[in-house]
């Protein structure tokens, strides 16, 4: 389960970052299994208004997941599970969406693991062909479209609206 405040960066996702020092649990919800930091299971379930779930098996060290591969949520590509100390237990799921072209922590950890740095945004603030069907949309507008598509696909466990500050070019907004 990844937690993101910047839905428009999902086309640039190349990795999911865990913390190797944390324990992670397999959580069964209905017929699906999800992985998240053991210490955050209750807060994730509460935030997503999920009452019926089961922790299956014993927790596993985040380090055990290092370099595993996963399928991108909607693009025809795979990503890599990597480890970073910037992943905390303060909020979220302990599994961080990582897009090296969008943020200092993401860039640095992507460099460490030689993960591709994908920037599917042009100089005008619109998504490029690297974003698939979202190409041509301004990043702020793409948030709504991507979220709607993820919701329709059943890929959203929950959502909360927040005000978020993100460094961007004032000319592109």
Segments predicted by a language model, with ranges:
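Residue patterns forming the tRNA-binding/recognition surfaces of aminoacyl-tRNA synthetases
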Residues: 1-11, 23-25, 67-69, 77-78, ...
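Short acidic/polar mixed-charge low-complexity motifs
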Residues: 32, 75-78
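Glycan-binding loop/region signatures in secreted carbohydrate-active enzymes
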Residues: 72
């Amino acid at each position: 389960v990844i937690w993101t405040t910047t839905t428009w960066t999902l086309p640039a996702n190349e990795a999911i970052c865990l913390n190797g020092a944390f324990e992670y649990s397999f959580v069964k919800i209905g017929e699906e299994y999800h992985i998240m930091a053991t210490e955050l299971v209750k807060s994730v379930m509460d935030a997503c208004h999920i009452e019926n779930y089961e922790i299956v098996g014993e927790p596993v060290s985040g380090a055990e997941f290092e370099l595993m591969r996963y399928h991108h949520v909607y693009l025809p590509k795979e990503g890599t599970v990597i480890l970073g100390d910037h992943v905390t237990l303060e909020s979220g799921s302990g599994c961080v969406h990582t897009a090296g072209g969008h943020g200092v922590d993401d860039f640095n950890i992507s460099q460490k693991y030689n993960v591709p740095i994908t920037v599917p945004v042009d100089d005008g603030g619109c998504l490029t062909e690297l974003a698939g069907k979202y190409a041509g949309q301004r990043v702020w507008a793409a948030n709504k479209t991507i979220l709607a598509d993820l919701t329709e696909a059943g890929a959203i466990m929950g959502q909360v609206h927040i005000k978020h500050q993100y460094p961007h070019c004032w000319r592109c907004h």
